[in-house]
Curated annotation (Swiss-Prot):
The lineage of its organism: Bacteria, Bacillati, Bacillota, Bacilli, Bacillales. Pfam families: Glycos_trans_3N, Glycos_transf_3, PYNP_C. Disulfide bonds: none annotated. InterPro entries: Glycosyl_Trfase_fam3, Glycosyl_Trfase_fam3_N_dom, Glycosyl_Trfase_fam3_N_dom_sf, Nuc_phospho_transferase, PYNP-like_C_sf, PYNP_C, Pyrmidine_PPas_bac/euk, Pyrmidine_PPase_CS. GO terms for molecular function: 1,4-alpha-oligoglucan phosphorylase activity; deoxyuridine phosphorylase activity; metal ion binding; thymidine phosphorylase activity; uridine phosphorylase activity. NCBIfam families: PRK05820.1 (NF004490), PRK06078.1 (NF004747), Y_phosphoryl (TIGR02644). Catalyzes phosphorolysis of the pyrimidine nucleosides uridine, thymidine and 2'-deoxyuridine with the formation of the corresponding pyrimidine base and ribose-1-phosphate. Belongs to the thymidine/pyrimidine-nucleoside phosphorylase family. Keywords: Glycosyltransferase, Metal-binding, Potassium, Transferase. Its cofactor is K(+). K(+) binds at residues 88, 90, 243, 246, 255. Substrate binds at residues 168, 187. One of its GO terms (biological process) is pyrimidine nucleoside metabolic process. This is Pyrimidine-nucleoside phosphorylase.
């Protein structure tokens, strides 16, 4: 088999066999296939696409290029949730203890943030003493005992994906549905999930800006999962404004605690209940989505979800008293109110710009090596559709520097107030095939 033949075959719009895809991935990881040939095939895929069988084969080739986490010692159906990323996306922090409280095992591998805000790991590390570097045996033991544990990404998972992603990043082949879908799904499958719930974001703060693109990605990932024996479904949710009210690590953790107490923002609570209901059904803990939703609401109302979060924090070395004493979380030195320049209704909160403003304060990373400030960020006091009076606070800037003129300038272009009301949509579609 020759790489040049595989490139020409895909260039001319033909279907690659599983053997050809395996030959490419194996050779590329070993270093036998040079970058210039790999980038040539990536560009051919970008223009000619792949069918469902090719996408599944590419995904499994990347899974098999490295280690796979063995979660077989964990009792029950392990359901993983993946979000394509957004601004103020606190769902994992709420979902993990919430679905664990209704007996769904959550063995979660999460990453650090790059860009707008921190990842789940950064947010959890805002809790004093919390550690995510735990070995596989401890990880499995914690999930069996308490139904929930979160670890940082480690080991040699999907090395082919890491190598191919770095190549796509510099060769203009990032925005390819088969390449994005196989990249995401290879990581989820290698992490040992039996079933997968996907939260595909769309809008100004999302990777997929249009609903059409988000749908294409959701369908691609759901089909890959189902084709390789992982029960998979996707929800397309809106990221035209940040989710919830908090953007920043300790601020989002506080918001997660409030949500588990039943006092969280409406949009975050609704998205968590929608995703959580799907997870509960996939884990065979309820027969219908309505029944699953009722179980989750009961777990919040009874305090069971909050108790689960406390035990989860304690199990991983963290100070569980932060739940009742949020002032023990990192606090920013200054709180600066950003006020409305006129009266009307909020019609636009550009997620990307608000995320960048939060990053300028120190809440996110530009490179993997950057340190982040866990205390800083932005809290939205108004959301799209809300009425606001001139001089009223639109948002609060939590900063460790007094001069935030650069941040204010960024925010000026991200907020629009008009004399008409806009009603945002939170959940656009549910995709099951």
């Amino acid at each position: 088999m020759r790489m040049i033949d595989i490139i020409e075959k895909k260039r001319d719009g033909h279907t690659l066999t599983t053997e050809e895809i395996n030959f490419f991935i194996d050779g590329y990881v070993k270093g036998d296939i040079p970058d210039y040939q790999a980038s040539s095939l990536a560009m051919a895929i970008y223009f000619q696409d792949m069918n469902d069988d090719e996408r599944a084969a590419l995904t499994m080739a990347m899974v098999n290029s490295g280690d796979m986490i063995d979660l077989s010692d964990i009792k029950g159906v392990k359901v993983d949730k993946h979000s394509t990323g957004g601004v103020g996306d606190t769902t994992t922090l709420v979902l993990a203890p919430l679905v664990a409280a209704v007996d769904v095992p959550v063995a979660k591998m999460s990453g650090r943030g790059l860009g707008h805000t921190g990842g789940t790991i950064d947010k959890l590390e805002a809790i004093d003493g919390f550690h995510v570097e735990i070995d596989e045996a401890t990880f499995v033991k914690l999930v069996n005992e308490n139904k929930v544990a979160v670890v940082g990404q480690s080991g040699n998972l999907t090395p082919a994906d890491k190598k191919l992603y770095a190549l796509r990043d510099v060769t203009g082949t990032v925005n390819s549905i088969p390449l994005i879908a196989s990249s995401i799904m290879s990581k989820k499958i290698a992490a040992g999930a039996d079933a997968i719930v996907l939260d595909v974001k769309t809008g100004s703060g999302a990777f997929m800006k249009t609903l059409e693109d988000a749908e294409a990605l959701a369908h691609a990932m759901v089909r890959i999962g189902n084709n390789v024996g992982r029960n998979t479904m996707a929800i397309i949710s809106d990221m035209n404004q940040p989710l919830g009210r908090a953007i920043g690590n300790a601020l989002e953790l506080q918001e997660a605690i409030d949500t588990l107490k039943g006092q969280g923002p409406k949009d975050l609570t609704e998205l968590v209940l929608t995703l959580g209901s799907q997870m509960v059904v996939l884990a065979n803990k309820a027969e219908t989505l309505e029944e699953a939703r009722a179980l989750l609401i009961e777990a919040i109302d009874s305090g069971a979800a909050l108790e689960k979060f406390k035990t989860f924090i304690k199990n991983q070395g963290g100070d569980k008293t932060v739940i009742d004493h949020p002032e023990r979380l990192p606090q920013a030195q200054y709180q600066i109110e950003y006020k409305a320049k006129k009266s009307g209704y909020v019609t636009e909160l550009v997620s990307n710009d608000i995320g960048v403003a939060s990053m300028m304060l120190g809440a996110g990373r530009l490179t993997k090596e950057d340190d982040i400030d866990l205390a800083v960020g932005i809290v939205l006091n108004k959301k799209i559709g809300d009425k606001v009076e001139e001089g009223e606070s639109l948002l609060t800037i939590h900063s460790n520097r007094q001069d935030v003129d650069d941040v204010v300038k960024k925010l000026d272009s991200s907020i629009t107030i008009a004399d008409y009301v806009v009603s945002p949509t939170l959940i656009h579609k549910i995709i099951t095939e």
